[in-house]
């Protein structure tokens, strides 16, 4: 696991990666507010389109998509 992360970090510009993750979690965390989530998805779509060109990030994003909504739903 540690080896997989280090290999992908070498290929990724760290700034772009963390900005994309930030936009992604902002969009998921404000599911209850439709107007805000539409704005956040616009930013997220641009960043994900950049990240999907990098090998390995599709798996990371898929894991976030699957895990995060369950955490949000469990709070209500």
UniProtKB/Swiss-Prot annotation:
It holds the Pfam family YmcE_antitoxin. The keyword Transferase does not apply. GO terms for cellular component: plasma membrane. It comes from the Bacteria. The gene is ymcE. This is Uncharacterized protein YmcE. It comes from Escherichia coli O157:H7. It is found in: Cell membrane. Its main location: membrane. Keywords: Cell membrane, Membrane, Transmembrane, Transmembrane helix. It is a single-pass membrane protein. The chain crosses the membrane at residues 12-32.
């Amino acid at each position: 696991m540690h080896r997989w992360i280090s290999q992908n970090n070498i290929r990724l510009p760290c700034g772009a990666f963390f900005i994309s993750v930030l936009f992604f979690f902002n969009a998921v965390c404000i599911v209850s507010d439709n107007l805000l989530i539409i704005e956040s998805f616009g930013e997220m779509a641009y960043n994900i389109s950049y990240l999907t060109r990098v090998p390995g990030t599709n798996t990371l994003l898929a894991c976030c998509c699957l895990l995060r909504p369950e955490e949000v739903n469990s709070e209500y």
